[in-house]
Swiss-Prot record:
Glycosylation, residue list: N328, N441, N574
Function comment: Catalyzes the synthesis of mevalonate. The specific precursor of all isoprenoid compounds present in plants.
Gene symbol of the encoding locus: HMG1
Pathway participation: Metabolic intermediate biosynthesis; (R)-mevalonate biosynthesis; (R)-mevalonate from acetyl-CoA: step 3/3
Subcellular location(s) per record: Endoplasmic reticulum membrane; Mitochondrion membrane; Plastid membrane
GO MF annotations in UniProt: hydroxymethylglutaryl-CoA reductase (NADPH) activity
The name this protein goes by in its record: 3-hydroxy-3-methylglutaryl-coenzyme A reductase 1
Length: 585
């Protein structure tokens, strides 16, 4: 407690007070609320009390003698009763003035500093150490210093630590305006023309509104200009996620160090072991099967026949070239590949598939679809466009259409793992892996009714690589569609393992790929930005690396399961020894 007291005192002394706190003449007193000096007020109410009581006693004695009911009172008696009650209330408060005086400068431990002293309130709110003690404890140090220290037992409220933020008077006015709702938080960037300053002001306003600290969320060291209008709105800081490296992954004759951003212990280590097994066995091979981003608007007609007419028109090969020309105007990289339609009554779903170069391509294909819809209004004026996306795409949702038709990059990756490597590195046997894969990834997933989930943990690797390289983490839903196959080859001595992933949605330009950290990870893989020699080559390479990393992760986890090492490894690498119950929330 003494440590907190000293730190609070020192930190407050470091701030220049707006006005000195007088200890004698200028100190606030409870009697300041009275209209007259204390000695005059006391004399008036003492005299009034005893006079009124004496008058009432005399009147009651006369009523008793004359047999007059006591409850029958005259106007003068009513005035005397009121005077005696009022003076009694004053005298009762007078005897408690000393007690009130001792508390008048010390706010309750359960409230923030009051608005009566604006400057002291701001110092208290900005002082980091003041959060460790009851509010106001640091402010009344001069008062307590005049009294002998006595142990006081109070119920202290634990406040979050508030970071020390240097704000100008202008910033302080803006913060108050945001807190009271006069200035919308989302408009700070446009009003201030300074993204870093806007984030700092928004952050401070949020802390004051919620009473919760954001001291653990970093603010400095980030380029807020880079995310304006592109990655995130109304920022108050940025997250820190550790990035580990798995590899080298030997894929198609080249080595790659795979960055993985994750908070799950054992994940990078396990994937790294899989990479080692693949490398010692001669590497893995990956092949691109399809490359096309999709978007499926939904339109409605008055009759199902009219919806069928449009379906036949769109699927007629003679009309495809015209539609492709209209679609491809949206971008110099966009190339319409196909249009597939599905009817539900009067509603028609049009699934456009488009090559998008090195971009993930959602915006590109959406603009192309809008061009085609505008073009179709000429021949089909009764077509009502319900939505640019009708979920037949299907984006960020597990869907059979993605599992069957594919979305983004469809990749298959395979490797033959030597029997000696299976035994020495993976600590299991070929036979055990093949049996476990059949019963877990195939039969077990079928029993669960899985859709694209015929794997051990593909989404673990996909999400970790996506976060590290600036992809959309929400698209791990369809991107993690994967079927893992294992088979004994070469007379049962070696293991053939493969992963087939029909919907890897990645890009090397746009979105989060332009952020400094994510751009560095893309550069590590050699896929930063757009390919100048062959448009789309970088995003295709990134997709194959994702598949290769998934292959390594599947191989290692399945081996741990087959050898009974899963629980042991997670107890070693995926448990925290920190006592989180002692961390203030």
């Amino acid at each position: 407690m003494e440590t907190h007291r000293r730190s609070s005192t020192n930190s407050i002394r470091s701030h220049k007070p707006a006005r000195p706190i007088a200890l004698e003449d200028d100190s606030t007193k409870a009697s300041d609320a009275l209209p007259l000096p204390l000695y005059l007020t006391n004399a008036v109410f003492f005299t009034l009390f005893f006079s009124a009581v004496y008058f009432l006693l005399c009147r009651w004695r006369e009523k008793i003698r004359s047999s007059t009911p006591l409850h029958v009172v005259t106007f003068s008696e009513i005035v005397a009763i009121l005077a005696s009650v009022a003076s009694f209330i004053y005298l009762l408060g007078f005897f408690g003035i000393d007690f009130v005086q001792s508390l008048v400068l010390r706010p309750s431990a359960d409230v923030w500093a009051t608005e009566d002293d604006e400057v002291e309130s701001e110092v208290l709110l900005r002082n980091e150490d003041a959060r460790h003690v009851p509010c106001g404890q640091a402010l009344d140090r001069s008062i307590r210093s005049l009294q002998p220290p006595e142990p006081i037992v109070t119920a202290e409220k634990v406040f979050d630590e508030m970071p020390v933020t240097v704000m100008t008077e202008e910033d302080e006015e803006i913060i108050r305006s945001v807190v009271c709702g006069m200035t919308p938080s989302y408009s700070l960037e446009s009003k201030l023309d300074d993204c870093k300053r806007a984030a700092a002001i928004r952050r401070e306003a949020l802390q004051r509104i919620t009473g919760k600290s954001l001291s653990g969320l970093p603010l400095d060291g980030f380029d807020y200009e880079s995310i304006l209008g592109q990655c995130c709105e109304m920022p108050v800081g940025y997250e820190q996620i550790p990035v580990g490296i798995a590899g080298p992954l030997l894929l198609n004759g080249r080595e790659y160090s795979v960055p993985m951003a994750t908070t799950e212990g054992c994940l990078v280590a396990s994937t790294n072991r899989g990479c080692k097994a693949i490398h010692l066995s001669g590497g893995a091979t990956s092949v691109l099967l399809r490359d096309g981003m999709t978007r499926a608007p939904v339109v409605r007609f008055g009759t199902a026949k009219r919806a069928a007419d449009l379906k036949l028109y769109l699927e007629d090969p003679e009309n495809f070239e015209t539609l492709a020309c209209v679609f491809n105007r949206s971008s110099r990289f966009a190339r319409l590949q196909s249009i597939k339609c599905a009817i539900a009554g009067k509603n028609l779903y049009l699934r456009f598939s488009c090559f998008t170069g090195d971009a993930m391509g959602m915006n590109m294909v959406s603009k192309g679809v809008q061009n085609v819809l505008d073009f179709l209004q000429t021949d089909f004026p009764d077509m009502d466009v319900i939505g640019i996306s009708g979920n037949f795409c299907s984006d960020k949702k597990p869907a059979a259409v993605n599992w069957i038709e594919g979305r983004g990059k469809s990749v298959v990756c395979e490797a033959i793992i030597n029997g000696d490597v299976v035994t020495k590195v993976l600590k299991t046997s070929v036979e055990s892996l093949v049996e476990l894969n059949m019963l877990k990834n195939l039969t077990g997933s079928a029993m669960a009714g899985a859709l694209g989930g015929f794997n051990a943990h593909a989404s673990n690797i996909v999400t970790a690589v996506y976060i590290a390289t600036g992809q959309d983490p929400a698209q791990n839903v369809e991107s993690s569609h994967c079927i893992t196959m294992m088979e004994a080859v070469n007379g049962g001595k070696d293991l053939h393992v493969s992963v087939t992933m029909p919907s890897i949605e990645v890009g090397t330009v746009g979105g989060g790929t332009q952020l400094a950290s994510q751009s560095a990870c893309l550069n590590l893989l050699g896929v930063k930005g757009a390919s100048k020699e062959s448009p789309g080559a970088n995003s295709i390479l990134l997709a194959t690396i994702v598949a290769g990393a998934v292959l390594a992760g599947e191989l290692s986890l399945m081996s741990a399961l087959a050898a009974g090492q899963l629980v042991k490894s997670h107890m070693k690498y995926n448990r925290s020894s920190k006592d989180v119950s002692k961390v203030s929330s």
